[in-house]
């Protein structure tokens, strides 16, 4: 028997609105034949207090107790996984990503946005990289791999599981990164994004190897870069830097605290422009570097890592965003363009914009909003799960 979770009275309201999370405080009691049936990552049925079926999902110890896979009574077998991956693939085909010679890397599965909470799958040419954020998805990884093989066929040569850093440590699953199927001669692979070339290392790189969620925003940087002197902070692999130089920037400087990241940015510059690119790199803390940059730059990119992964640290995080933006706004040349981002799920669009407004006031600059940015369409947002809109950005014109 599949373990059954019964909700407290009235706690089914979010499920009636098709929200895919059930919080631990909503649970009244649990029925299971054996305690072992109710292990971390187990498939569970969810019922109202009165015994009305509501959903099937993966159980996990923690604040989010159940991640809903379906609101229907259905068997979660190989055919189910094949269908879910096929539906995600069809969405990307609609977006002209699956057979696009100019873009060979994209996100295939984006968790709740594709009704597969706890799962990320990114495609890098012939290699699929899986990251499981829940124990339930980790237990299903071989079924997921089989579904990927079914959907992609011979176009896929390897499937790499990179879940060791994304699984909850309390689950104690002993996950080890490695190939679930196939192999690759090299852990690095050259991919195309809007015609720009990037070397991606899914084994050693951050996330799955590349930040795919900035694809469209990088293209916008390219549009504004012509003739400008560009500073790309928190550069990682230099994605924004490559696009800026491709767009005709006069000079680009890439800054990151990681020497390895700076080396990757340089490698990608050489890959696209050879050894004579008008590019410099600095291994330094970006916040400290911005203390005194003078008026050299007229296009600055601020794309920091998440300052607030939890609401408990939100106050300190917003102070950090304010300080970072104030430093850039106070020193950017008149007529300059600032691209500023937050990837913190806990930071709403309204809060981020208010914080940037206060930074502009501190800097004493007249500022216009030119664009309000978000994640691309291959990182879709489940309309019933607004928390999925994690990336927010502003493009500012600074007088």
Place the predicted regions along the sequence by residue.
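Mobile active-site "lid"/loop adjacent to the S-adenosyl-L-methionine
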Residues: 297-327
